[in-house]
Each structure stands twice: as structure tokens, then as C-alpha cells.
Amino acid sequence: MSTEPDLHAIGIDEGVAETRERLVGRNVPVIDDPAGASWGVYTDPSGAKVAFGRAEDGTEYTDANLESPHAYPAQGYRVSYNLAHFDLLEGGDREGRFLAYVDNPTALTLTEPNKVTVRPAALGAEVVVYASEDEYKQAQSEHDGLTLDAKHLKSPWLLALHSGDATGDEASSVAMFAAVVQSAQLRTNELTGREFWYVLGESVVPMAIALPAETAQNLHPGAVIAGAFIIVASVEA
């Protein structure tokens, strides 16, 4: 049994098969689309979500997701069955471009951009916590090479997709991400009984963030969380 980092971030330490077994009997609606694919979303009282489904080619997936209070206008389209490309258009300007695993894939078309409302979130995979923006900046200054501010979201797979060096099936939503904590709360995932951090933070835009419980003893407003994150989203067409 191996734990997927996105599931671990929301308090699920079992593997994919065990997680799906836990969903049996939860009466999660499953949506079938005409192309032969299907998908469903379990929403936990804690705000944690588990998206699962089967693509047109029969490939199955199980991904973590997260409820977020922050919604933004965007242009979005799918690059594979459940991986989507988004341009955030807050205030009419592009505020960010990123890839995200979506929990409701049929809200987007494949390759053709749609105007949608998106609720992005970030799930911590390899995370460093800094006590303040000053501490984060100091740590950045001690490293040679690329330095990023405390509110960034960089999807490395974007360049490969746009250049044609990678396909949507090869890409992922893993990103370099940092945010300043606005609030943080230890919540219990009722599906498993395990805790995780539910964080509201300001990155390129404010969004919800999930971190494994062991990430920090005390996350506080003004702290900076940075590292490798899995970006996810819910779409309102």
C-alpha cells in the first residue's frame, strides 16, 4: 500500500484501492457521459474531497480535491480527461496560468477554451514552512539561481505542453507554489478520522490549501508555506 501525496494532504493515508473501498456505501452520485467516461466526487464535512472516475479509454483515476471559498473567472480547457489548463482573469487581466486536476471534468471541453468560474486549491506534497515573509526572503537570498516571491504558482509542465514536447496525458499539475497564510485550522477528515491542515492563504490569488497534519506544529497568519504542491480545482460552467 502506498499513499498518494495529494490524498495524504487531506488526511487519507491509505492507497487508492483502499480509499475507493471507503467510498462504497457513501452514496456518491456518479455521472456518466455519452463518450463512455464517468466521474464522481465525495465531499467530506471537513472540506476534503475525493474525485474519482474513468476516462474514455478506460483509465481510472482517484484524486484529492478541496473545497474553497474563493472563485474566479477564467478561461479553461482540458488537456486530458481530468487535467485542465486555466488562465485566471481576475479584474479582466490574467492573474495566473496553471494546470489543475478537476473534480468535474465534463464542465470543460477538450482543447477548446471555455469561459468558466473556477475554485482553485493547492495540496502540499513537499512543503517548507517559514515563520514570516522576511524569513522566507532570507532563505531565498541564501540560494543561487531562481528566486521567487512569497506568492507564486509556477506549473513546470506548461512550457512542455505549449512547445509540444509533452502531451496532456504525460503532464501533471505539480507546481512550485508559495502562499502567505491568512488562517489555518486543524480539521478531521471524517472519512478516515485523520487530521489535516485547512489553510486559507494568499498566493497569486487567495485560495484554499491542504497540508498534512505533520507539516507544522503551529501554522499562524503571516507564515509562508512553499514547495511542491498539487494544484486542483472545481469548475462552475
Language-model features: where?
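Extended boundary segments
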Residues: P156-N189
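Short, Lys/Arg- and Gly-enriched loop/turn segments at beta-strand edges
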Residues: I230-A237
